[in-house]
């Protein structure tokens, strides 16, 4: 029996490899002689760099950058063994994990640290950058990142400002003359798991603002600011990013990648599956187990478990998903190829307590799934 375990991380709780190992322990308790293939995955957010570095025999480079609240934070990115491709998660520099829950405020947070990661990768000789969009604490349209790369945002008084979600409305002009010239000669791909536009009811502010600390009034303000930002970008670059699918990813970082860096957006899970030779690994598999921290209606729109299931169905392999939690409206994932969904949460609990017992609950859930699989296999229904 061959079981492929390809799970995403459980955000702010367990890395993808830790989830995969817990599933293997649980399944292994019932099927100790089975062949297990672990493929930690990501869809552009947390854990993506680890997956890509492992797949390319690369290395992790760590150093301090400007955090979302403009304080120094420890961040990292990955570099392939041949030093040609850099793997960057914007969450490593500009993610929610750097901002305590009580301090989350997308009006003041910045993506400047992500730009500093890109600069470092350029200094290391990167010719191709894969930038994972996801898990951000920001809503600045990528302007903070651009400022680190040399772009200057100027207000009505002629002053250069430090852009954030709350200051975009004050921009009256943009100076691109000092933008790092090396950016013109490299390939940039943004790994993106959503197709939300920059603005509007499905835009960055209204869909993702709340998890970053925004209330209703703040979301309206953020959306208006991004509309102004899009208008200014259009004046200079003749590119209207306001309605482009994916431009709203990661607080509008997608817009900056498309309009200014001339990069492309691609489903993050597709990038990861290609780099990990996923199709090769699943040949001959009897079962694939996938998962992520929360399985809900958003999972059906290009997130990691569905990306895994879509590939698996090409080979007619059944797929089971394990989630840290499962929302009542998760059923759309069945239409995308996931055959069964299980939650590791066994009783009402706080988020903090759920984090503490996540690993043992994953193992227990996997063991129970394996036990049912064993019964079904022996009965030959």
UniProtKB/Swiss-Prot annotation:
Nucleotide-binding keyword on record: yes
Gene name of the record: glxK
InterPro entries found in the cross-reference section: Glyc_kinase_flavodox-like_fold (IPR018193), Glycerate_kinase (IPR004381), Glycerate_kinase_RE-like (IPR018197), Glycerate_kinase_sf (IPR036129)
SUPFAM superfamilies: Glycerate kinase I
Keywords: ATP-binding, Kinase, Nucleotide-binding, Transferase
Lineage: Bacteria, Bacillati, Bacillota, Bacilli, Bacillales
Protein name: Glycerate kinase
Enzyme Commission number(s): 2.7.1.31
Pfam families in the cross-refs: Gly_kinase
One MF term in the entry's GO annotations: ATP binding
Membrane-spanning segments: none
Reactions the enzyme catalyzes: (R)-glycerate + ATP = (2R)-3-phosphoglycerate + ADP + H(+)
GO biological process: organic acid phosphorylation
Annotated family: Belongs to the glycerate kinase type-1 family.
Record organism: Bacillus cereus (strain ATCC 10987 / NRS 248)
């Amino acid at each position: 029996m061959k079981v492929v375990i390809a799970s995403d991380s459980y955000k702010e709780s367990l890395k993808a490899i830790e989830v995969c190992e817990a599933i293997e322990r649980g399944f292994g308790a019932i099927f100790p002689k089975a062949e297990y293939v672990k493929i930690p995955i990501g869809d552009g957010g947390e854990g993506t760099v680890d997956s890509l570095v492992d797949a390319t025999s690369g290395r992790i480079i760590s150093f301090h950058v400007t955090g979302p609240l403009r304080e120094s934070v420890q961040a990292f990115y990955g570099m392939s063994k041949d030093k040609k491709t850099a793997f960057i998660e914007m969450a490593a520099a500009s993610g929610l994990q750097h901002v305590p829950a009580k301090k989350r405020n997308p009006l003041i947070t910045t993506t400047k640290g992500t730009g500093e990661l890109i600069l470092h990768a350029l200094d290391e000789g990167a010719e191709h950058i894969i930038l994972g969009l996801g898990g951000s604490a920001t809503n600045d349209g990528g302007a903070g990142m651009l400022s680190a790369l040399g772009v200057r945002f100027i207000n009505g008084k002629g002053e250069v400002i430090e852009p954030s979600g709350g200051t975009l409305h004050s921009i009256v002009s943009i100076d691109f003359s000092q933008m790092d010239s090396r950016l013109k000669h490299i390939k940039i791909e943004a790994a993106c798991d959503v197709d939300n536009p920059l603005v509007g009811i499905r835009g960055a502010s209204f869909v993702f603002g709340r998890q970053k600390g925004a209330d209703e009034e703040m979301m309206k303000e953020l959306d208006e600011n991004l509309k102004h930002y899009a208008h200014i970008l259009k004046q200079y670059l003749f590119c209207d990013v306001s309605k482009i699918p994916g431009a709203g990813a990661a607080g509008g970082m997608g817009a900056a990648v498309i309009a200014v860096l001339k990069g492309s957006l691609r489903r993050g899970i597709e990038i990861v599956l290609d780099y990990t030779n996923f199709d090769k690994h699943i040949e001959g598999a009897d079962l694939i187990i996938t998962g992520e921290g929360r399985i809900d209606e958003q999972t059906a729109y290009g997130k990691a478990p569905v990306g895994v299931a879509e590939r698996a169905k090409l080979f007619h392999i059944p797929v089971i998903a394990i989630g840290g939690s499962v929302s009542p409206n998760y059923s759309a994932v069945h239409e995308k190829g996931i055959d069964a969904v299980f939650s590791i949460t066994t009783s009402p609990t706080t988020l903090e307590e759920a984090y503490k017992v996540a690993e043992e609950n994953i193992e227990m859930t996997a063991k129970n799934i394996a036990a049912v699989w064993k019964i079904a296999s022996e009965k030959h229904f």
